[in-house]
Amino acid sequence: MSLLTEVETYVLSIVPSGPLKAEIAQRLEDVFAGKNTDLEALMEWLKTRPILSPLTKGILGFVFTLTVPSERGLQRRRFVQNALNGNGDPNNMDRAVKLYRKLKREITFHGAKEVALSYSTGALASCMGLIYNRMGTVTTEVAFGLVCATCEQIADSQHRSHRQMVTTTNPLIRHENRMVLASHTAKAMEQMAGSSEQAAERMEVAGQARQMVQAMRTIGTHPSSSAGLKDDLLENLQAYQKRMGVQMQRFK
């Protein structure tokens, strides 16, 4: 896996699924291929994206700034600076300075990533902020190691909370989680519909699922009643995708 492919993988792992994720993936590909060289327009686009957390925007802004060649005097963006200030916690800044000193001694992506992984997300974000604000300099490879370590920590915490949600023993939470997942699957089906032959059928199944979830929420049902809902939807989606030769993984 090339360095830029690895960076793209880690960064996309913290972006919520949906049309925006596909758009960001395309922007990253263009930036890494040298096809998008207007940093100012790119940052303006990023600033106005919905759904993304401030930290995710900050990380993406940092990656774009590292990669796109720009004029030396180009102003730093406030939304990136605010996201990479470690929540204003002086402890994060102290740790960030210590981490920065260690990163100065590193020369490889993997070396930098390994060093960075032992720090908290707040300290990692603050360290990115130091570099972004030109208060310190490291090689691009080392900066990317810092980015990937931060994304890995964020993705790990998201995965842990997802696992806790799945294994929770509270039937009401499990019931709601199944309905949320069913809704998301229906949304994915609608987004994939396009103008294919199966589009009408897929839209119909997705619409029925949405109605079912809405009805279950409106009238209230026993928690066990939603058990098969998500699985039925996933099976339908998988069947349609198989027919079209599209892989299923991203919707599991």
From Swiss-Prot:
A motif (Nuclear localization signal) lies at residues 101-105. The keyword Membrane applies. Its main location: virion. InterPro entries: Flu_matrix_M1, Flu_matrix_M1_C, Flu_matrix_M1_N, Flu_matrix_M1_N_sub1, Flu_matrix_M1_N_sub2, INFV_M1. Keywords: Host nucleus, Membrane, RNA-binding, Viral matrix protein, Virion. It is a peripheral membrane protein. GO terms for molecular function: RNA binding; structural constituent of virion. Residues 1-164 are annotated as: Membrane-binding. One of its GO terms (cellular component) is membrane. It comes from the Viruses. The keyword Ligase does not apply. It is found in: Virion membrane; Host nucleus. Transmembrane segments: none annotated. GO terms for biological process: viral budding from plasma membrane. Residues 165-252 are annotated as: RNP-binding. Plays critical roles in virus replication, from virus entry and uncoating to assembly and budding of the virus particle. M1 binding to ribonucleocapsids (RNPs) in nucleus seems to inhibit viral transcription. Interaction of viral NEP with M1-RNP is thought to promote nuclear export of the complex, which is targeted to the virion assembly site at the apical plasma membrane in polarized epithelial cells. Interactions with NA and HA may bring M1, a non-raft-associated protein, into lipid rafts. Forms a continuous shell on the inner side of the lipid bilayer in virion, where it binds the RNP. Determines the virion's shape: spherical or filamentous. Clinical isolates of influenza are characterized by the presence of significant proportion of filamentous virions, whereas after multiple passage on eggs or cell culture, virions have only spherical morphology. Filamentous virions are thought to be important to infect neighboring cells, and spherical virions more suited to spread through aerosol between hosts organisms. Belongs to the influenza viruses Matrix protein M1 family. Homodimer and homomultimer. Interacts with NEP. Binds ribonucleocapsid by both interacting with genomic RNA and NP protein. May interact with HA and NA. Cannot bind NP without genomic RNA. Most abundant protein in virion. When expressed alone can form virus-like particles in transfected cells. This is Matrix protein 1. It comes from Influenza A virus (strain A/Budgerigar/Hokkaido/1/1977 H4N6).
